[in-house]
Amino acid sequence: MVVGVLTVELQVPASRSLKDKRQVVRSLTARLRNSYNVAVAEVDHLDSWQLATLGVAAVAGDLAYVQGLLQHVVDYIERQPGTVMLDYATEYL
């Protein structure tokens, strides 16, 4: 069994309040869950109105599958309007 953990740091430049940021983050996390069947949560910068850190986890029996899945998630996030990906890190357990 392989567990992949992806940490993504995002900027939400158009956000003017925590409510604006949370709306963007909720929408993105719901789309990731539905499209890629991964677990997603906001894990840092909870009180910052322009920054968000998402944690994404995937579990499978094959390392190559988990690597590909998390790369698709990164590509998807990069294409999203309204957010700028500042950094990301991946680790496998």
Model-assigned labels for residue ranges:
Residues 2-8, 34-36, 50-54, 84-86:
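A generic structural signal for short beta-strands and their flanking turns/coil linkers
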Residues 3, 41-62, 91:
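Short, charge-patterned binding micro-sites
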Residues 4-13, 18:
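Short glycine-/aliphatic-rich beta-strand segments at the starts of folded cytosolic domains
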Residues 11, 27, 31-44, 67:
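Amphipathic alpha-helical assembly/interaction segments
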Residues 21:
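C-terminal binding/interaction regions
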Residues 24:
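Conserved alpha-helical elements of sugar-nucleotide-dependent glycosyltransferases
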Residues 58-93:
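C-terminal structural segments of small proteins and small subunits
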